[in-house]
Amino acid sequence: MNIDRKILNKALAKEKVANCQKDYTDIESKFARRTPENTVEDTCHLIPGVTESVANCHFNHSSKTFMVIHGWTVTGMYESWVPKLVAALYKREPDSNVIVVDWLRRAQHHYPESADYTKLVGEDVARFINWMEDEFKYSVDNVHLLGYSLGAHAAGVAGSRTNTKVSRITGLDPAGPNFEYAEATSRLSPDDAQFVDVLHTFTRGSPGRSIGIQKPVGHVDIYPNGGSFQPGCNIQDALRVISQKGFGDMDQLVKCSHERSIHLFIDSLLNEENPSKAYRCNSKEAFEKGLCLSCRKNRCNNVGYEINKVRAKRSSKMYLKTRSQMPYKVFHYQVKIYFSGTETTTYTNQAFEISLYGTVAESENIPFTLPEVSANNTYSFLIYTEVDIGELLMLKLKWITESYFSWSSWWGRPTFTIEKIRVKAGETQKKIVFCSREKVSKLQKGKEAPVFVKCHDKSLNKKSG
């Protein structure tokens, strides 16, 4: 019987690859199953090719598996966030397996070298997952990879090389340098798992130079606070921490925004009753104007663990505001105001304060700035509160003067007439219209804040998408 030589060679090559894959001695990455009782230390390693190691580490074959992949390290040691994330995962999923992928030796080289090593680390992780699937028939539908910085791209490489697609990859501020313009096969991409979600928290700088990658690389890409920088991470906060804790925490300050991605995910695990919401938007500028607080047709989503796994044809860029510390959730509002009057001057960069009063609490003197204000125009802007004030009942609006001895006090104060203020609450999707408590409210710069209450016409106030 004649056998086509090309077919035979192809079959032999395939068999050779299969046999090589069964030799796992060249895998350098380590896979430690940490426990709820010991989230800090790697006490038990699952070793590819050594079947008894899985039983020895008490691996739960019927539960979810989280694989945590760290990023670049200067010290060659795990960072302090690792046990925090492990503990939070176990608190949310007590019967799960949390495996920390140790690639510390490769991660402590100069950054470009460690960036190149992500391909080998990803290959190691993929071979481990394939072995678990082949040897134990473990369902890859139960596997969730969580990669931080360079670890996010290692997770992407792993996902692209598994025999069956893993359920989910979460990219925690995937690294930017060496990856912003890289091919999809060398970095995290939507093709690497059944669902890929990404948190971008430190994208400040030009593309390719920012610590975190700027472009969307998942099915859903979330940019908290615009993604460039995070509240609580500025120089004033740095000086405060140094005064309290000394210079020993300086490295944490440098990583503050980058690492915020991890803590936002931890927050979603610990505060499951109140998930933060992100909103789909074409740009952060449009989001800052409050134009994107819609939840219709999957336009809003939960942040972190309980995200709705929506796979669109192209990546969804989503935005939200957060607090500077955990819990990070805030409450978003779009405010629209029509400024009427006879003023002929256009005022630029004007500072205002708005106060919100609700059935549960109030949030007073929330500052905002309008780039320009002129008569007979409508302006939309975004504000947020750090507390849930309940259903809105009343507003106050104040136009702030630059100083007591400003030019306006000499030449007469600029004045606008405000009849109605329209507010949309992002979290509840309610639209409310507020009318002046007086017949007409005069908004004067530096003067007392006029009061607005819910309009009596019920048709003006409704729930909307």
Curated annotation (Swiss-Prot):
Residues 331-454 form the PLAT domain. One of its GO terms (molecular function) is phospholipase A1 activity. InterPro entries: AB_hydrolase_fold, Lipase, Lipase_LIPH, Lipase_N, Lipo_Lipase, PLAT/LH2_dom, PLAT/LH2_dom_sf, TAG_lipase. Residues 420-424 are annotated as: Important for heparin binding. Its EC number is 3.1.1.34, 3.1.1.32. The active site is at residues 149, 173, 258. High level of expression in expression in adipocytes, heart muscle and mammary gland. GO terms for cellular component: chylomicron; extracellular space; plasma membrane; very-low-density lipoprotein particle. The keyword Membrane applies. Keywords: Calcium, Cell membrane, Chylomicron, Disulfide bond, Extracellular matrix, Glycoprotein, Heparin-binding, Hydrolase, Lipid degradation, Lipid metabolism, Membrane, Metal-binding, Nitration, Secreted, Signal, VLDL. It catalyses: a triacylglycerol + H2O = a diacylglycerol + a fatty acid + H(+); a 1,2-diacyl-sn-glycero-3-phosphocholine + H2O = a 2-acyl-sn-glycero-3-phosphocholine + a fatty acid + H(+); 1,2,3-tri-(9Z-octadecenoyl)-glycerol + H2O = di-(9Z)-octadecenoylglycerol + (9Z)-octadecenoate + H(+); 1,2-di-(9Z-octadecenoyl)-sn-glycero-3-phosphocholine + H2O = (9Z-octadecenoyl)-sn-glycero-3-phosphocholine + (9Z)-octadecenoate + H(+). Glycans are attached at residues 60, 376. Ca(2+) binds at residues 184, 187, 189, 192. Residues 407-411 are annotated as: Important for interaction with lipoprotein particles. It is an enzyme of class 3 (hydrolase). It is a peripheral membrane protein. Homodimer. Interacts with GPIHBP1 with 1:1 stoichiometry. Interacts with APOC2; the interaction activates LPL activity in the presence of lipids. Interaction with heparan sulfate proteoglycans is required to protect LPL against loss of activity. Associates with lipoprotein particles in blood plasma. Interacts with LMF1 and SEL1L; interaction with SEL1L is required to prevent aggregation of newly synthesized LPL in the endoplasmic reticulum (ER), and for normal export of LPL from the ER to the extracellular space. Belongs to the AB hydrolase superfamily. Lipase family. This is Lipoprotein lipase. The lineage of its organism: Eukaryota, Metazoa, Chordata, Craniata, Vertebrata. The gene is LPL.
